[in-house]
Amino acid sequence: MRDRLAPHHLAREVGDRDAEVFGGDLDGGHAGAVGDQSQRAAAGAGAEGVVLADQAAVGEVGDEGGDRAVGEAGGGAVWAPMNTPAAKGVFRAGISESGAVTQPNDRATAPAVSQLFTKRNGLPATAAALRDVSKMRLRDMEDKLRAPGPDGSAASLLGLAPFADGTLIPATSAEVLKSGADQGIPLLIGFTAHEFAAASLSGEQPEVTDATLPAALGALGFAPAATAAFRAAYPGLTANQLAGQAQSDAVIRMPSFRVAEMRAGRDQPTWLYEFTWASNATEFRGRSFHCLDVPFAFDLLKATGVTAVAGDNPPQPLADAVHRAWVAFVSNTDPGPTWPRYTLDRRETMIWSDVPHVQSDPFAAQRPIWLQ
């Protein structure tokens, strides 16, 4: 699914129709993500690649106003480098689509994730060892890292991501967010309704029951009282479905919401969205899963692989609306007059559904969980 809807593949089909697109693949940053200390600022190597690529893009285009970074799944690798000293003046705006933006990325966590990666894959977590590993094998290795187990953690659940090394990334994403030290440039941020709820991040695992649900939520870092709160926020779901939704919330939806909340509290220009349109493809029917919004953002519903995951006849008017907002934001750092900024008094959020609309405080039921 990730390959079929990968943004850097879809970007090749955009051409120069609406905006100049520089596509990149963060797989080359795996060595930095696992914290290989054999190279300078290695823990942030993936983020360093983003900064260097954007510096090159700005130089190529000649836009003195700065670049606009867009990341899907790697949205966290957009937000993290956007707030590094090296990126000052490079970015004019950012879009984080389904980004894991406040994952545990302190320097002490990096070696722990690196050691677990090596333990589960039998390969040293170094740049030299991973340099010639195929992309598919890297993804298999990442799945092993994220598999549940007594030696796992919230950080390993996320997998590979930029870590604060004290140099390129001086502070963790959470520290930057709480301190208000982020650069405060315009940010468009959001997620899909279900993300990974339909299929576990870590592949096969035992079905969660009512009896094991509290433990499953605890493994994600939620307090025991969260069980009742999740049932209230997502009525009608089975224990197994709740566990899947909680996983999606913990990794992507909750952190993104926190970023919007904290930025809004500092009156920094922020726009929040939820993509709720659901696939009608047999394998994914009724689910708004991770990556489904990407072909809508690029307005490429007829691109290779889209029908297999979105189903027949995905709504072109929705793609027109999403794409129009993305292009407007990239061009003017504002998605348009029909999408208001996110503020704490109204919490207006764009809902990308069959009929796109703005809804006030759509996450009122989840907020007590997400802001704890």
Regions found by a protein language model. Give the residues of each.
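Short linear motifs in low-complexity or flexible loops
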Residues: 6, 11, 18-22, 30-33, ...
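Alpha/beta-hydrolase fold nucleophile elbow
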Residues: 66-72
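Short glycine-enriched nucleophile-adjacent loop
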Residues: 75-87
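Substrate-access "cap/lid" subdomains that shape
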Residues: 88, 93, 97-216, 243-265
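Mobile gating loops/cap/lid regions near enzyme active sites that modulate substrate access
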Residues: 201, 254-372
